[in-house]
């Protein structure tokens, strides 16, 4: 190619570049005119329309308040009964960035109280199901998922990039961990819990000034005293109310309604039955001697990450590993060696709560709870008042819902009542349904 042809090509490219620049400038001007005469807008016109009826509520702070939400980063730990409604309303309100920590999968038994999920999502990770639903609800919301179980080993990797934490978990162990990590990172926590038809919520470590969860509860609950949703049940709308109230508290924090000058620690208690009631209790400020947020804390980032803080042991987790392999039966072994036999020279004791037992049970079984067994003196005569046919040498098979309480009951029967031939069914009543008789109802 000659110098003359190169000059010609360069000239042509220069002309084309100038044309593209003019086109770009025209497009920018058209966009400005479309957005209005007020110049650069902090949101798209679609977002103005979407959040308009929220922005005109005085408490939200108008446009400036909405811009705060748009840039906010909120992490929700747990996409269950509390997390689902909280996520829905926070995404709907226009939170710009949401994080979801949950390693559970959607089960059919979740759907009555976790409205982000639906039947088609059964078997999917909850965080993925929630992300899909929230993205349909609000495409302007960026969502990051963490399909992991929160632990001391990963909490300090997950929490730092988020402005606000919502604790929507269902165990004291998780609540202590979340609070401890939040204190060490200077994060505020909105914490809720619910069971049956009631629940409560609080705000911990507001603006890193306390109080924290340990200030409220320096002593953990007694082992076995904490009832889960699986065993105690939950009414969907009641837990939903609490999740929505958590979203309200989160928005108040992000709007700047609460300040260091006006914030007072509180505990809010909700009850759905027999009449709906909501009570607010004033709580004390940060305890100077608190092990985490006090003047001389011993619960630090290093002690947490090292595993030195034994959350499970501190919260009195029940040790179910109390039987040898020989003291346990599979559902198939129970069916073949006991239940299917015409001559039943054994007793089957179902230790689920009475309400569970009445929903569904195997015919001919007896029903007593672990608590009832534990509270007895330990004489065979006392036990015979409830199970007349029982003798010290009779074969006894113990059944519960999942195969946990039955282990404890088996140990009690052998150690306290000195019964020789007692075994439990691994996986409990539900394992029997899955493996032997799927026509029985699960609940």
Curated annotation (Swiss-Prot):
A biological process from GO:
cell budding
Q: Which cofactor does it need?
A: Zn(2+)
Gene Ontology CC: one annotated term: cytoplasm
Chain positions recorded as ATP binding sites = 81, 102, 109-113, 126, 170-171
**Its Gene Ontology molecular function terms?**
AMPylase activity; ATP binding; identical protein binding; metal ion binding; nucleotidyltransferase activity; thiosulfate-cyanide sulfurtransferase activity; URM1 activating enzyme activity
Q: Where, subcellularly, is it found?
A: Cytoplasm, Cytosol
Keywords linked to the UniProt accession: ATP-binding, Cytoplasm, Metal-binding, Multifunctional enzyme, Nucleotide-binding, Nucleotidyltransferase, Transferase, tRNA processing, Ubl conjugation pathway, Zinc
Give the pathway listed in the UniProt entry for this protein.
Answer: tRNA modification; 5-methoxycarbonylmethyl-2-thiouridine-tRNA biosynthesis
Function of the protein: Plays a central role in 2-thiolation of mcm(5)S(2)U at tRNA wobble positions of cytosolic tRNA(Lys), tRNA(Glu) and tRNA(Gln). Acts by mediating the C-terminal thiocarboxylation of sulfur carrier URM1. Its N-terminus first activates URM1 as acyl-adenylate (-COAMP), then the persulfide sulfur on the catalytic cysteine is transferred to URM1 to form thiocarboxylation (-COSH) of its C-terminus. The reaction probably involves hydrogen sulfide that is generated from the persulfide intermediate and that acts as a nucleophile towards URM1. Subsequently, a transient disulfide bond is formed.
- Protein name, please? Adenylyltransferase and sulfurtransferase UBA4
Q: Read off the lineage from the record.
A: Eukaryota, Fungi, Dikarya, Ascomycota, Saccharomycotina
């Amino acid at each position: 190619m000659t110098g003359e042809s190169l000059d010609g090509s360069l000239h042509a490219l220069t002309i084309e570049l100038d044309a593209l620049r003019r086109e770009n400038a025209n497009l920018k001007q058209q966009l400005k005119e479309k957005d209005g005469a007020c110049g650069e807008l902090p949101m798209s016109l679609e977002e103005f329309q979407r959040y308009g009826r929220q922005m005109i509520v005085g408490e939200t702070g108008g446009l400036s308040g909405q811009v705060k939400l748009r840039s906010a980063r909120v992490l929700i730990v747990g996409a269950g009964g509390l997390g689902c409604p909280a996520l829905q309303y926070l995404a709907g309100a226009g939170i710009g960035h949401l994080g979801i920590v949950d390693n559970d999968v959607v089960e059919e038994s979740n759907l009555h109280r976790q409205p982000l999920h639906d039947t088609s999502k059964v078997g999917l990770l909850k965080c993925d199901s929630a992300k899909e639903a929230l993205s349909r609800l609000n495409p302007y919301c960026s969502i990051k998922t963490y399909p992991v179980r929160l632990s001391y080993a990963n909490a300090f990797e997950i929490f730092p990039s988020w402005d606000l934490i919502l604790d929507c978990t269902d165990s004291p162990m998780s609540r202590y961990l979340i609070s401890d990590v939040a204190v060490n990172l200077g994060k505020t926590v909105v914490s809720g819990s619910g069971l049956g038809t009631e629940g409560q919520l609080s705000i911990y470590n507001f603006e890193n000034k306390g109080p924290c969860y340990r200030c409220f509860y320096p002593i953990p609950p007694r082992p076995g005293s904490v009832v889960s949703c699986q065993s105690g049940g939950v009414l969907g709308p009641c837990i939903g109310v609490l999740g929505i109230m958590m979203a309200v508290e989160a928005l108040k924090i992000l709007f700047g309604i609460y300040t260091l000058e006006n914030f007072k620690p509180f505990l809010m208690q909700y009850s759905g039955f027999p009449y709906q009631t909501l009570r607010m209790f004033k709580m004390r400020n940060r305890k100077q001697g608190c092990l985490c947020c006090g003047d001389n804390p011993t619960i630090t980032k290093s002690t947490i990450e090292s595993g030195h803080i034994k959350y499970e042991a501190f919260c009195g987790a029940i040790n179910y590993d109390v039987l040898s392999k020989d003291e346990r039966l599979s559902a198939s072994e129970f069916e073949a060696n006991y239940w299917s036999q015409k001559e039943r020279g054994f007793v089957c004791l179902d230790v689920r709560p009475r309400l569970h037992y009445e929903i569904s049970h195997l015919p001919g079984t007896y029903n007593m709870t672990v608590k009832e067994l534990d509270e007895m003196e330990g004489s065979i005569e006392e036990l015979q008042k409830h199970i007349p046919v029982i003798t010290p040498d009779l074969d006894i098979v113990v059944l519960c819902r999942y195969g946990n309480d039955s282990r404890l009951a088996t140990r009690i029967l052998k150690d306290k009542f000195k019964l020789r031939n007692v075994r439990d069914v691994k996986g409990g009543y539900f394992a029997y349904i899955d493996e032997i008789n799927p026509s029985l109802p699960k609940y």
